[in-house]
Structures are given as structure tokens and as C-alpha cells.
């Protein structure tokens, strides 16, 4: 109920563990997931991909080198179109790397293993599933976890409820899949997509329960631009979502970094060039924006827990 009805819990901000608790264990590993559960995370977020023989497993990168003792790429593509490489037999005995880069004792986890670990304990958010949604969904359904699992991807990839519904066959599965979907919306779309609000409204009307809203600074149109929807004017798009009792999700980076621009282990994401303009890591700023997020995705759970408890935002 906390996830589905954020308006009923104004003093409780949910915490999602980004790739588990990878401060002490390899990211997207089973022990990282268990550690996050033990710390009290409300949700675990992890990334999935698949082998060329259709085994779904946890891995963020396109290649093996940064995170495992293996080498080479495992997927290639863009948007919701990918090619996959390496069989599960080639992958299952690789060792995951610690944050230091050294090999650990842990192996890649299958999605089935990760979901089974989370079942009846914690909510789940699955990232990078856009090319494997039907397979992911039917596995979640077979485990009896459709009310416990969400998945997310950019709204550009699936801009309408119908684009999600067409991935599965029967009406009930279609309804449930839309309910599980968390569209990710970047602030720049406020200018680039004139139909953005109508698309978001269509998802809400179809049962979608939350959006990951990516805004970086005070001047972002998500914070500054009034919106008028069905004759009602709102301060900004976030306040409209709040009025609709729809969850707002944000992902700030580590709080001790400069303007959110710290990059772990010198691994550079070439598609991101923030240039000191990202204020999401400043939690004081984030929670004082016109509508503070109802759920924060974090790499540093222990710090965020303490912070939210101190300001009275972990009270049910």
C-alpha cells in the first residue's frame, strides 16, 4: 500500500537499493541483494540481460570485462532491439568482481534466483528489460510475484499503454503489465515532446503507478513550468503527479560527490556529460523541490536511511 498510495504516507520516503548493496558485495549479485534486504530497503533495483540461449541473468553492462572475470560483449543494440551473445554455459561459472576490481567468490545470478530471493520480502524494480519484457513477465507471473515487481525503461521506447499491452496476449496480462511499468521521463522531453503529458496521462489512466522523473537543477522545466490538464492548472508536472497519487521516483548519485558527477572506478559513461549541473545528489535540495520524490534509488543505503530518519521521512 505504501508504494501504491504515496499520498497516504507523506512522512515516508521509500528507498530502493541500486543494484543491491554493492558497497560490500559485487553489484547485481545475490549477496548484494540479500544485504540490501537485511538493511531494510523497500525495493531492490537490478539490471537484466540474457544469454544467447535465453537465460535471463543480472548484468548492467554491454560487456563482461568491468564486472566479471570474463571478456567480450554480451549484447549489442539500441532501444528495444538487441542481439545477445554467449551461452549460459559460457557465463555461469564466471566470477563477479568486487568494487575494487578483484575477483570475488560470487557468480552471475539468474533472474529466477534473484526474484526467488526477494519473494515476499521486498519490492523489485527491473531495469534494462525492454527487449525481454514478455519473457521477464511470464517468469515473474510463474513465481507469483506480479504484485511485487515493477520494470522500467525510457518512455520513448514504449510511449503508449498499447505499445506495452501488445507484448502479451490476454487482457489480464496486458492490464498487469501496464501496472508494473515505470516509465522513465527526462526533463528535456518537456521541450522535445509536445505530447508528453497526454502520454503520461494515458499511462496513469491505464493503471501505471509511478514515473521515474529525471530533473537536475532548479531551472529544469519539470520544476518551473506550469501545466494545465483537464482544465486544472498545476505548478509543475510533479505536482500534477502528486495530485493523481502517482509515485515520483528519483535516482541521485552518491551524496559526498561534487554535483553528482563522481564516477565509480574511473568507468566513464560517454553518453553522460553533466558538467557540474546535476544537483540530485544534494538531498537537501532534492527534498525541498516543489514535489520531493516519494521513492529514492540509492547506492548508499546506510547514509540515506540515517538522513531520512533524521528529517522524519521514514515514518509510516
Predicted features along the sequence, with ranges:
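Phosphate-group recognition and catalysis centered on beta-loop-alpha active-site segments
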Residues: 1-316
Amino acid at each position: 500500500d505504501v508504494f501504491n498510495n504515496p499520498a497516504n504516507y507523506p512522512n515516508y520516503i521509500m528507498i530502493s537499493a541500486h543494484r543491491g548493496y554493492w558497497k560490500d558485495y559485487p553489484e547485481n549479485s545475490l549477496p548484494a541483494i540479500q544485504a540490501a534486504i537485511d538493511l531494510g530497503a523497500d525495493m531492490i533495483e537490478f539490471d537484466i540481460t540474457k544469454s544467447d540461449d535465453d537465460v535471463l541473468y543480472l548484468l548492467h553492462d554491454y560487456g563482461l570485462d568491468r564486472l566479471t572475470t570474463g571478456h567480450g560483449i554480451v549484447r549489442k543494440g539500441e532501444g528495444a532491439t538487441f542481439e545477445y551473445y554467449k551461452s549460459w554455459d559460457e557465463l555461469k561459472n564466471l566470477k563477479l568482481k568486487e568494487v575494487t576490481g578483484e575477483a570475488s567468490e560470487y557468480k552471475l545470478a539468474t533472474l529466477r534466483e534473484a526474484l526467488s530471493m526477494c519473494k515476499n520480502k521486498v519490492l523489485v524494480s527491473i531495469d534494462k528489460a525492454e527487449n525481454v519484457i514478455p519473457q521477464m513477465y511470464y517468469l515473474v507471473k510463474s513465481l507469483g510475484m506480479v504484485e511485487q515487481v515493477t520494470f522500467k525503461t525510457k518512455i520513448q521506447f514504449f510511449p503508449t499503454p498499447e505499445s506495452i499491452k501488445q507484448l502479451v496476449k490476454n487482457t489480464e496480462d496486458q492490464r498487469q503489465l501496464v501496472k508494473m511499468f515505470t516509465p522513465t521521463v527526462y526533463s528535456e522531453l518537456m521541450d522535445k515532446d509536445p505530447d508528453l503529458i497526454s502520454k503520461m496521462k494515458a499511462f496513469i489512466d491505464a493503471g501505471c503507478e509511478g514515473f521515474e522523473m529525471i530533473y537536475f537543477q532548479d531551472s529544469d522545466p519539470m520544476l518551473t513550468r506550469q501545466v494545465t490538464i483537464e482544465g486544472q492548472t498545476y505548478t509543475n508536472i510533479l505536482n500534477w503527479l502528486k495530485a493523481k497519487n502517482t509515485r515520483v521516483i528519483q535516482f541521485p548519485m552518491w551524496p559526498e560527490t561534487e554535483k553528482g558527477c563522481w564516477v565509480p572506478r574511473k568507468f566513464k559513461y560517454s553518453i553522460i556529460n553533466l558538467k557540474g549541473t546535476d544537483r540530485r545528489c544534494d538531498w537537501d535540495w532534492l527534498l525541498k523541490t516543489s514535489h520531493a520524490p516519494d521513492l529514492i534509488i540509492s547506492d548508499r543505503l546506510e547514509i540515506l536511511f540515517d538522513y531520512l530518519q533524521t528529517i522524519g521521512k521514514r515514518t509510516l
